[in-house]
Amino acid sequence: MQMIIGDLRKDPHALETAWVSVIAFAGVARTIVPLHEIASFYPPRLPVGGGTSLGAALRELTVQIDTQVRKTTHEAKGDWKPVVYLLTDGRPTDDTTAEVKRWKDHYASKVNLIAVGLGPSADLNTLRQLTENVMLFTESQEGDFTRFIKWITASVTAHSRSVGDDKQPELSQTEYIVRLAKDEPVKAYDENCVTLTGRCSKTRRPYLMKYERPPARISGLDFSLNLNSFNIAGCYPIDEDYFAWSDATATGLQVNTSELHGVPGCPHCGNASAFALCSCGKLLCIDGPDDVICPWCETGLSFSNDGGNTNFDVNRGRG
């Protein structure tokens, strides 16, 4: 976002006509920057949370349009037609039916919405219900994301130069980086990753574990085969805001540890395993056989190597 705003400030048309607002959505949706002129806009820190509440995001967007975008009256000219860039990398985890219908009935004709799916797990079918301008970004080599940011900047600049025109500028495509997503297959859910949250047993600070499903190629066959397993991609420290931005509704989704390959260490204290389960159903870190206090529920726990079957079910996040 810093790069986008920096480039827009160099363009006199954008500097004079464009105002920017930022709505973030994970398990919840909130406006983190209300409509603001570019000259004094300060790029915010984007939050991280569990879930993709697209319905809530649409509801928040319409509230901001109704309250922040000035309408033309007999006394004064209102704002130009808003341009909205909707970026999402997953499928909605809330019910979007009512909000999609309300958008199509009352807002679609008044807003130029450009929806961009980020990666193969984006629910393009839902995005197509909102707008004809559905694009897909797939990062395939180093530097693609930087070029994608440049594409957004160029698109905003083009719209700022066309204010007052009846016809909006056509969306340019940058080779394989951003392309129209008309014929992409619909994915009902993200089956390519598993996210789990835990807490450090020493510092009580939270962390996020991510497992990804690897594509397997069979020699001589021109297709990839997804196996029923996930490899560890990383374990990352997060802050308490993660839970404030996550959907607290229980999903009932679980995964068995037999499907998860690799045990990460704790990113906070360095304990050997960030994957120990308390009877409360939450994960914590341990450093081998030990007596610890669960940082979630304060229960005293004793872990040992008993040589038995250690596979168990664990609650997975929304992604």
Q: Model-found features: residue ranges?
A:
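Von Willebrand factor
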Residues: 1-33, 40-81, 83-87, 94-95, 115-125, ...
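VWA/integrin I-like adhesion module and closely mimicked acidic/polar interface patches used
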Residues: 72, 90-130, 137-139
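C-terminal helix of von Willebrand factor
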Residues: 124-188
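Short, flexible, mixed-charge glycine/proline-rich loop motifs
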Residues: 185-197, 253-274, 283-289
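Short cysteine-rich clusters marking metal-coordination/redox-active sites
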Residues: 200-203, 266-269, 277-280, 294-297
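Cys/His-rich microdomains that often coordinate metals
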Residues: 204-211, 272-274, 282-284, 300-303
